[in-house]
Amino acid sequence: MQLNAHEISDLIKKQIEGFDFDAEVRTEGSVVSVSDGIVRIHGLADVQFGEMLEFPNNTFGMALNLEQNSVGAVILGDYLHISEGDVVKCTNRLVEVPVGEAMLGRVVNPLGKAIDGKDDIDVQGARPLEIMAPGVINRKSVDQPIQTGIKAIDAMVPVGRGQRELIIGDRQTGKTAVAIDTIINQKDSGIRCVYVAIGQKDSSVAAVVRKLEEYGALENTIIVTAGAASAPALQYIAPYAGCTMAEYFRDRGEDALIVYDDLTKQAWAYREVSLLLKRPPGREAYPGDVFYLHSRLLERASRVNAEYVEKMTNGEVKGKTGSLTALPIIETQGGDVSAFVPTNVISITDGQIFLETDLFNAGIRPAINAGLSVSRVGGSAQTNIIKKLGGGIRLDLAQYRELAAFAQFSSDLDSETKAQIDRGQRVTELMKQNQYSPLSIAEMATSLFAVNSGLLDDIEVNKVVDFEAALIAYMNANQILLMSKINDTGDYNDKISNELQAAIDDFKQNHTW
């Protein structure tokens, strides 16, 4: 078959007319150097701070240093396959993490990818890693309690919804145990929980997952983990990722709780990243913005008003307030709370629960130091009955610790001092609580009423714990209506006081422990 010149020109015209080409404009650069998870890139003129960068083999990084002739970025994951000369592309979007109900019950890395061996997560959307904290006008005062189920905390240092309460202490003093017990106690409260594990052993995180599953709290919890073997950049962004996931629930008019375990390791990771990026070091070799590292994270925990929720949901949710409560954990060295990072976080938060090694070793667990622990806003959110019955507990314990130290040097004590020491010993025993056994409001109120009314004065100190366990079992079995009323209303009046008195008197007369 022969084609003449006219047919050939027609074919060429058709080909030209049918040619479809969409011009794609993007900024590209090339890798100049790569080491220790830090990449120097040349040519990304339009990159913005915190932007997600695309590397070969579906690897992503984050731009942190914007210099005149180069860009310093951290790799979010494995970087061993990246080499000099590789092409780097801008994505024109900040680092994002997936959010939504589907994340509950799952273990994910800081980028939101499942690492629990189950199916992929069907995410409902994504949000930027870093979001501005709600403004002053959008906030509401903290006036609702979050029950930890731990007597010593709910009575002495209560936590409110939307509060930031620091848990601080040396290693192996029960900091994680307090946080996990609090999460377990939320399984029927409707409060969504996020547990962020930073720089921990994978075996430790697996143990936490097993415990939450055992007590039925995992289905209500998201676990974000950046283990000890993870890149420092992932440990640095892990708290922000967890916070973004928790804010999804707050902004929909729900209540959420987030635990950062722990921010000391995040500060170490950020220090490592900053030094590798050749940022000038300051005190203890931390960069100059280490305070801002934690303040911009913890300020995102808040209680927001209904107008804010309505705006964030585009009018879908009306008339509901939301809250995000933060329990950051800080590890101290040798009980030194005046070190750089601990003082920073203490100044940012709304109070602290100080756990002491000496108390822990003495068998007083949770090892809460009543004198150094404080809650700056939780008192206004405390349940009425716990507030009235537990008001003097903190003072009793603090005075007892002082008197006990003084009594070691003197054998001749007046009757009033002896009475205070005897009461303090019983209160100390009463504040002991086993791990994974949170108490309801009514159970807590029963214990506090017993010690406040002097009903423990004739109980031997070493029998107080057994007496309390038997009393609570008796109340749950024989005083169901009274316990339900206290749990439902949280009120305290003369009628409830008389009923509690009669019930405990009956127990002491007719039961053994």
UniProtKB/Swiss-Prot annotation:
Keywords: ATP synthesis, ATP-binding, Cell inner membrane, Cell membrane, CF(1), Hydrogen ion transport, Ion transport, Membrane, Nucleotide-binding, Translocase, Transport. The keyword Ion transport applies. ATP binds at G169, D170, R171, Q172, T173, G174, K175, T176. Gene3D superfamilies: 2.40.30.20, ATP synthase alpha/beta chain, C-terminal domain, P-loop containing nucleotide triphosphate hydrolases. It catalyses: ATP + H2O + 4 H(+)(in) = ADP + phosphate + 5 H(+)(out). Its EC number is 7.1.2.2. It is an enzyme of class 7 (translocase). InterPro entries: ATP_synth_asu-like_sf (IPR023366), ATP_synth_asu_C (IPR000793), ATP_synth_asu_C_sf (IPR038376), ATP_synth_F1_a_nt-bd_dom (IPR033732), ATP_synth_F1_asu (IPR005294), ATPase_a/bsu_AS (IPR020003), ATPase_F1/V1/A1_a/bsu_N (IPR004100), ATPase_F1/V1/A1_a/bsu_N_sf (IPR036121). It is a peripheral membrane protein. GO terms for molecular function: ADP binding; ATP binding; proton-transporting ATP synthase activity, rotational mechanism. Coiled coil: none annotated. The record marks S373 as: Required for activity. It is found in: Cell inner membrane. Pfam families: ATP-synt_ab (PF00006), ATP-synt_ab_C (PF00306), ATP-synt_ab_N (PF02874). The keyword Cell membrane applies. It comes from the Bacteria. GO terms for cellular component: plasma membrane; proton-transporting ATP synthase complex. SUPFAM superfamilies: C-terminal domain of alpha and beta subunits of F1 ATP synthase, N-terminal domain of alpha and beta subunits of F1 ATP synthase, P-loop containing nucleoside triphosphate hydrolases. PROSITE patterns: ATPASE_ALPHA_BETA. F-type ATPases have 2 components, CF(1) - the catalytic core - and CF(0) - the membrane proton channel. CF(1) has five subunits: alpha(3), beta(3), gamma(1), delta(1), epsilon(1). CF(0) has three main subunits: a(1), b(2) and c(9-12). The alpha and beta chains form an alternating ring which encloses part of the gamma chain. CF(1) is attached to CF(0) by a central stalk formed by the gamma and epsilon chains, while a peripheral stalk is formed by the delta and b chains. HAMAP family: ATP_synth_alpha_bact. NCBIfam families: atpA, PRK13343.1. Produces ATP from ADP in the presence of a proton gradient across the membrane. The alpha chain is a regulatory subunit. Belongs to the ATPase alpha/beta chains family. This is ATP synthase subunit alpha.
